[in-house]
Amino acid sequence: MTISNTRPITPDLIASHGLKPDEYERILNLIGREPTFTELGIFSAMWNEHCSYKSSKKWLRTLPTKGPRVIQGPGENAGVVDIDDGDCVVFKMESHNHPSYIEPYQGAATGVGGILRDVFTMGARPIAAMNALRFGSPDHPKTRHLVSGVVAGVGGYGNSFGVPTVGGEVEFDARYNGNILVNAFAAGLAKTDAIFYSKAEGVGLPVVYLGAKTGRDGVGGATMASAEFDESIEEKRPTVQVGDPFTEKCLLEACLELMQTGAVIAIQDMGAAGLTCSAVEMGAKGDLGIELDLDKVPVREERMTAYEMMLSESQERMLMVLRPEKEEEAKAIFVKWGLDFAIVGKTTDDLRFRILHQGEEVANLPIKELGDEAPEYDRPWTPAKVPSPLATNDIPQADVADTLLQLVGSANNSSRRWVYEQYDTLIQGNSLQLPGGDAGVVRVEGHEAKALAFSSDVTPRYVEADPFEGGKQAVAECWRNLTATGALPLAATDNLNFGNPERPEIMSQLVHAIKGIGEACQALDFPIVSGNVSLYNETNGQAILPTPTIGGVGLVRDWSKMARIRFAVADETILLAGAPKSWGTHIGQSVYMRDIHGRTDGPAPHVDLAHERKVGDFVRGLIGDGLVTAVHDCSSGGLALAVAEMAMASGIGATIAAPAEHDAIPVFYGEDQGRYVVTVANGAVETVAARAKAAGVALPVIGRTGGDAVKLGDARPVSVNALRSAHEAWFPNYMGGDLAPDN
């Protein structure tokens, strides 16, 4: 099928391109005439939510994005942060939600491919990947099929490309039944004096197309990613791109080789809206026009129209502004790697975006208004509604030991081994901590002691209950997970997944979550350096849980002192850093209430950022001085789940006392923030206690390691083997069932 280049512009056609009547009026006023069909497609791609951030830009500007280590914040392909010694880490997280629901394998695979390109476009070699996945209820007929396809797609692309997957999340909730989330993170290493940007410079310079050929896959993908779903979703399958990780690996090597020659003035990967977005962004950032001749674009399908070529989202492609004298040298590199190299246009001084096809001018538009001066909205939002606290007599009871077994074997708290064993976690040979701990850790090649830690976090049920506190908590938990390895948290990337921003109650979630994220990042010196917004995650008016995923990076100065979650040996002292007087108090929005009693009421836990910082800095100091033997942050499932995970990771049991005269349920299952379980060798307990007192950090002794069971207070002991069996069984049992019908 080919799309005609001369279709009449009708209200239905305008609406099908995701443009509102007032936006179309704005186009008419801007260009003084009716747009051509190709121009309509270009406006649709550049002015949609996915490319323009028109609903969120106002609020994103409020986030803290600067810091002493920040080399490049938001606005480029990825953020860049200094990690000393002339090295920097380049990273970003981005969603591929809508495509992954329609076509799970290719949607997830190209999500990984896209984020890897964002990183190596900046001149960095990718060293780590993570993915945060959210699926519908396990008993929904599509869920198993989607899990299987997405996990295979993530693994298939990342493994073949050759980047280790070191962390991530997998969560189930009925609110994702119609819209799953696939948030992909990648990080790479570069030299601080060799970072490449997308801003075009110089007039009359060649614009070069690099990589794979252009096909019809993904035409209209960015527009599809900015729309709600309805019953016609299956018809959108052709808008999903198809990826080839081996071509991408060649593209990586060719780009890095080319970058060493001094030939590259500006470079931009072709992601959402393909050739359109990459050309417009390069030109608009550099205050230059761009002229493209589509007859020179390498294609793999016959009779492609200008519309299709401009909006194709074929993968593994780059656009570059090149030094003309380096043309032959550059071409030789790409030919060597078996990739296309074609001069498809030039930079101009007239701020116009001109497209030529078969001798005709099919588009001539103002480039700034397409790019950095696209429409921006201040959408209405409602005041936040926060649930009232639970009454003290409204904490339902359950057997503490039975609850522990039930939770470790539940859909959302069980082992994710089935998932991450499909990913290559060790490729490149630098992985120090694998999925299953608080954070993934990767050695920095060329340095004896330096490593980087990575974590991805958000608790959507908290954000739903209180978007402001939930936004704070996502940042705080990410910061805490990095700290728990001994890393100094450096910076973060945010992936904001929400429903339809035209609904004031959804816009309210987005606004308050961003406010919470900003406040936490400010307080924790954890700036946001890159990110992505995914809106319209709704099907038939049912929105997802608000899910502002935070991906963070931390610096480990000496990985030989790095902490892990597993108990080291028996007969060590267990302490709870940052504990309130009764160790745990907050049961609202806990997994205990949700998974044991089916209740989702009550407020989200409060995040005291000063407390969070004080306790985290204290724990990191203990790790750096070699005074603790294991560390694990307390999050979902509270103290009980944290201790159980430490026991399961090591095979060593634990006996935990219980503070007298306090209800055991909030003590063990409360989800108070800013707490870490730490173990200390007996000879170091006094030193650690003295340091805690000096720092003003609560550090009660709560128990001892040893034995082959976990005993919580007066509850019966539960053997580590029983916990492991329950923990490891859920995922393989679920996925081993007959595949649910794909309908």
From Swiss-Prot:
PANTHER family: PHOSPHORIBOSYLFORMYLGLYCINAMIDINE SYNTHASE SUBUNIT PURL. This is Phosphoribosylformylglycinamidine synthase subunit PurL. Its main location: cytoplasm. Pathway: Purine metabolism; IMP biosynthesis via de novo pathway; 5-amino-1-(5-phospho-D-ribosyl)imidazole from N(2)-formyl-N(1)-(5-phospho-D-ribosyl)glycinamide: step 1/2. Its EC number is 6.3.5.3. InterPro entries: PRibForGlyAmidine_synth_PurL, PurL_linker, PurM-like_C_dom, PurM-like_C_sf, PurM-like_N, PurM-like_N_sf. Mg(2+) 1 binds at residues 94, 532. Part of the phosphoribosylformylglycinamidine synthase complex involved in the purines biosynthetic pathway. Catalyzes the ATP-dependent conversion of formylglycinamide ribonucleotide (FGAR) and glutamine to yield formylglycinamidine ribonucleotide (FGAM) and glutamate. The FGAM synthase complex is composed of three subunits. PurQ produces an ammonia molecule by converting glutamine to glutamate. PurL transfers the ammonia molecule to FGAR to form FGAM in an ATP-dependent manner. ATP binds at residues 53, 92, 494, 531. The active site is at residues 50, 96. It catalyses: N(2)-formyl-N(1)-(5-phospho-beta-D-ribosyl)glycinamide + L-glutamine + ATP + H2O = 2-formamido-N(1)-(5-O-phospho-beta-D-ribosyl)acetamidine + L-glutamate + ADP + phosphate + H(+). It comes from Sinorhizobium medicae (strain WSM419) (Ensifer medicae). The keyword Magnesium applies.
